[in-house]
Every structure is written in structure tokens, then in C-alpha cells.
């Protein structure tokens, strides 16, 4: 049974003044020191067609050269490739993960191109949820792979968004912070670029696509975020090559007709993107991922598992009540399954017994048949043996008679010879 515990309301809180220094004013410093020692993680998902400049822009944003293998247009499907890096600036360590959508937009049938991306984002949420639900959690050492920002690279067509872009962003907007950017903006004339930006934003609004809104509720960033929001989507140019401009070297793209400077705000919005993504709103992107997108996923998953905050009468549920209800439901299902399995087992045993009896009957019939056959064969052999024995006896009798006749004939011949001899001898005398 749940026990109701009273909680103080805001009206019950009293403001008190301190008579001396206590020391909790150092909490912000403690938090900064702890965060600095732990380091930070930031995960970026780059969604865009092959060859649109995703890797180059990442190299330019973080002022380094990341390892990246050039992708081909022959991928059978979309696959996501994640790579993690350890970066350090001053005394701040950042574990950066860049996830690339290899093969996106290269297939003839693009209907399911968004699915691997959604599945990857959900898989990272699920991994974090499973870690969070463990009895012995280790979130301090856990490598958080949830996507904090999705840079959606829009092809610089100058006309409108492709249906693939609209469908993909619509599928992703409830799962990740989408920041749309126009890639290779130096391929569009400036007047066309302004029209293209307006067209993109109107299409996003008309199709109900929710992109990341830069926070304006904090005084420290409200003004800059409000100013930068009107420039969405950012038209960017990426380059790691440095070109000499005047007396300085600057990152730029050299063309026969001139030079496009990456960090010149009159040429592109790269600086605005870097300010918004890294220097101003990186922590807000991390916070929005946890408090909005992950919480939505977590709530849906727990509701699927049967956990909820209120009963059908909108009365609050305690965790213990939810656990007991779920446990009883599980035990009921378990007993039902056990009974079904028992009945199935009994039925299978009966079927097996019937099969064994039938097999035993067949074996007995075969045995009886073999036994009769054996007896018949035995009788035939015995009869044949008797016939042979009779033939042997008859043969022996005939043989004995023949031998007797032969001996008698020999004796009679011998006697006759003797008589003739005696008669001859008598005549000489």
C-alpha cells in the first residue's frame, strides 16, 4: 500500500538572510571543476547525399583532419558509420563522435532510406536506457552515444526541398535536434540563395517539420540566438585549404573567378553555424537530447513495458504499485503459459504414446510374420532333410546289394576255376 508523503509547496519556502559566509557560492566553481575533469562528449549525425561535403565541413568546423574514407555512389543501401575522437582545447577534453550516413540518396528506390538512420538513433537511446535501468549503474563511465545534433545537408538546387529530405526530416524531428544547412553554398548566386532559404523554411513549416530552435529564454544567449535564427538554414562552405588573401592566410576556396572565404560572413554562414553549434548552444543541444528526445523515447518504452504514472482514474501511481501490478500481471501470464505448456506436453505425450503403441503393434505383426515364415522355412528344410536321408538310405541299401551280388559272383567264379583246374589235373594222371 502506498504511503502519501507531503511535499512543501513554493508558498511554504521562506527566504532567509545569512549572517556570515557559508561557502555554497563556490558550487558553480565545483561544477566547472568536476565537468572539466570528467570531460565532455558530443555526438553529431551528418545526413546528406554522397559527395555533398559532409567530411570537409567537419574538418573545417573542428579545425582538424579527421580520418574519412571516400564513399562511392554504388552502395546497395544506407549504412551508418560512427567514428570517435578525443579532442582537447586548452584544458577542456571533448570526446567527439561523428556519424556519417554512407550511401544516403544513392539508391533508385529511396522510400526506406530514412529507416537505418531512425534505427541507429533508437539503438543509442535503447543502450542508454538499458544502462539506466541496471541495478548497478555506471553512467559516470558510460560512453554516451546518443545523437546531440543532426546536421542535415541540403543539396544547393536553388528550387525546393526534395521529397527524400522532407520525409527524412519528418521522421527524425521527434528523435534528434535537426539543424538544416545548405551545402556548397558557393554554387548558388546570392539573390537565389535568399529565395532558396525562404522556400526551405516555408516548406518545413507547411509540412510540420520541427527543427532545432535556438534557446532565447536565457539572457546570456537570447540576443545572439534570436539574431542567428533568421539566417536558417545556414548556407555553408567547407575547406581545409588556406589561401593567401592580402597579407594573411585564410581558409578559402580558390576559383578562376575569385576566392570564397570560409570564415567571411559576407561569403557564407559558416561562422554563424560554428557559433550556434559549438560556441553558444552545444550544452543546450546535449540537454535537449536528454530532456526532450530521450525522455520521449524512455516514456514510450516504459509505457510499452506497462509502467505508467497514473491509473485509468488519473490517480497517481507509485513505482511500487506499478511494480506490484506488473508483477501480478506477469505471474498471471506465466501461470497461463505454464498451463498451456502443460496441456501441450500432455497432448504431445499422448500423441507419442499412440505413435509408440502403433509402432509396437507393427513390430509385433512383423515379428509374427517373420516367425511364421521361419517356421515354414524350417519345416521345408526338415522335410527336404528327411527326403535326402531316405534317398541316402535307399542308396546305401542298393550299394550293399550290389556289393553282395558282386562278391557272390566272384566266389562262384573262383569255385568254377578251381573245378576246371582239378578236372584238368585229373586228366593228366
From Swiss-Prot:
CDD domains documented for this protein: CDC_Septin (cd01850)
Tissue specificity remark: Widely expressed, except in leukocytes.
Coiled coil: 320-415
Modified-residue entries (Phosphoserine), positions: 9
UniProt keywords, alphabetically: Acetylation, Cell cycle, Cell division, Cell projection, Chromosomal rearrangement, Coiled coil, Cytoplasm, Cytoskeleton, GTP-binding, Nucleotide-binding, Phosphoprotein, Synapse
Domain Septin-type G, chain residue ranges per copy: 38-304
Protein localization: Cytoplasm, Cytoskeleton; Synapse; Cell projection, Dendritic spine; Cell projection, Axon
Alphabetized PANTHER family for the sequence: SEPTIN
Disease tied to this protein: A chromosomal aberration involving SEPTIN11 may be a cause of chronic neutrophilic leukemia. Translocation t(4;11)(q21;q23) with KMT2A/MLL1.
Family membership: Belongs to the TRAFAC class TrmE-Era-EngA-EngB-Septin-like GTPase superfamily. Septin GTPase family.
Protein name per its UniProtKB record: Septin-11
Gene name, Swiss-Prot/TrEMBL: SEPTIN11
Amino acid at each position: 500500500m502506498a504511503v502519501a508523503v507531503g511535499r512543501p509547496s513554493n508558498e511554504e519556502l521562506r527566504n532567509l538572510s545569512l549572517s556570515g559566509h557559508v561557502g555554497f557560492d563556490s558550487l558553480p566553481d565545483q561544477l566547472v571543476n568536476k565537468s572539466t575533469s570528467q570531460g565532455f562528449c558530443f555526438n553529431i549525425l551528418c545526413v546528406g547525399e554522397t559527395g555533398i561535403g559532409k567530411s570537409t565541413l567537419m574538418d573545417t568546423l573542428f579545425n582538424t583532419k579527421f580520418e574519412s574514407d571516400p564513399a562511392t555512389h554504388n552502395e546497395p543501401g544506407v549504412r551508418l558509420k560512427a567514428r570517435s575522437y578525443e579532442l582537447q582545447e586548452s584544458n577542456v577534453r571533448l570526446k567527439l563522435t561523428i556519424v556519417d550516413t554512407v550511401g544516403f540518396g544513392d539508391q533508385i528506390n529511396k522510400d526506406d532510406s530514412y529507416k537505418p538512420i531512425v534505427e541507429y538513433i533508437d539503438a543509442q537511446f535503447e543502450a542508454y536506457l538499458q544502462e539506466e535501468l541496471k541495478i548497478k549503474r555506471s553512467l559516470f563511465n558510460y560512453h554516451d552515444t546518443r545523437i546531440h545534433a543532426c546536421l542535415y545537408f541540403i543539396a544547393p538546387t536553388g528550387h525546393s526541398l526534395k521529397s527524400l529530405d522532407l520525409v527524412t526530416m519528418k521522421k527524425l524531428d521527434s528523435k534528434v535536434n535537426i539543424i538544416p544547412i545548405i551545402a556548397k553554398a558557393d554554387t548558388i548566386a546570392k539573390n537565389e540563395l535568399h529565395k532558396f532559404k525562404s522556400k526551405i523554411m516555408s516548406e518545413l513549416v507547411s509540412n510540420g517539420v520541427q527543427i532545432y530552435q535556438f534557446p532565447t529564454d536565457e539572457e546570456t544567449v537570447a540576443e545572439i540566438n534570436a539574431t542567428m535564427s533568421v539566417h536558417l538554414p545556414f548556407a555553408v562552405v567547407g575547406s581545409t585549404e588556406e589561401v593567401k588573401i592580402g597579407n594573411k592566410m585564410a581558409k578559402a576556396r580558390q576559383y578562376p573567378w575569385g576566392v570564397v572565404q570560409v570564415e567571411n560572413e559576407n561569403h557564407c554562414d559558416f561562422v554563424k553555424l560554428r557559433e550556434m553549434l559549438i560556441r553558444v548552444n552545444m550544452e543546450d543541444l546535449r540537454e535537449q537530447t536528454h530532456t526532450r528526445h530521450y525522455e520521449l523515447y524512455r516514456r514510450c518504452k516504459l509505457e510499452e513495458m506497462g509502467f505508467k504514472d497514473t491509473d485509468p482514474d488519473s490517480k497517481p501511481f507509485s513505482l511500487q504499485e506499478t511494480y506490484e501490478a506488473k508483477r501480478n500481471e506477469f505471474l498471471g501470464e506465466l501461470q497461463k503459459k505454464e498451463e498451456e505448456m502443460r496441456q501441450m506436453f500432455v497432448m504431445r505425450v499422448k500423441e507419442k504414446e499412440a505413435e509408440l503403441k502403433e509402432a509396437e503393434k507393427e513390430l509385433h505383426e512383423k515379428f509374427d510374420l517373420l516367425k511364421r515364415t521361419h517356421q515354414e522355412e524350417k519345416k521345408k528344410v526338415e522335410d527336404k532333410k528327411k527326403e535326402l536321408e531316405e534317398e541316402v538310405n535307399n542308396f546305401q541299401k542298393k550299394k550293399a546289394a550290389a556289393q553282395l551280388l558282386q562278391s557272390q559272383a566272384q566266389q562262384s567264379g573262383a569255385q568254377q576255376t578251381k573245378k576246371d583246374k582239378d578236372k584238368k589235373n585229373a586228366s593228366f594222371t
